[in-house]
Amino acid sequence: MHKVLLSIGTNTDTCFNMKRAIDNLHSCFPNIQFTSIIESAPCGAIFKGPFLNILAYFETNMVKEEIQGRFKSIEKIMGRQSSHKAEGIVIIDIDLIQWNNEVLKPEDFKRDYMNELIVQMQDIVGN
């Protein structure tokens, strides 16, 4: 089984979009577990804020590319467009940040809000 850690963020209609993302992810990955949702300031001048952020964890036999494809499908269903980033709009962003023991997005772990979410996730999964 592969261990999957992902981060989810939104700065647009935040409560609605976060709930939709959680529901969609739970439909795709029934054993998924989530931290609490926390608010953060935007990273970078282009993004509008505030953001809502959450971490999620699940185990699966799927390959990494299939999982990432499902994340992209959820983002597309929710209305994410490539032009939004340049406008500072993040309807939803679902990122695979750790695959088993491999950190895929080390810069994400440096964000201020991540420490709190990582501690929560360790309590949830017992690692």
Could you describe each region identified by the protein language model?
Residues 1-5:
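Extreme N-terminal starter segment of soluble prokaryotic enzymes
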Residues 8-10, 56-62, 98-101:
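Short beta-strand-to-loop capping motifs
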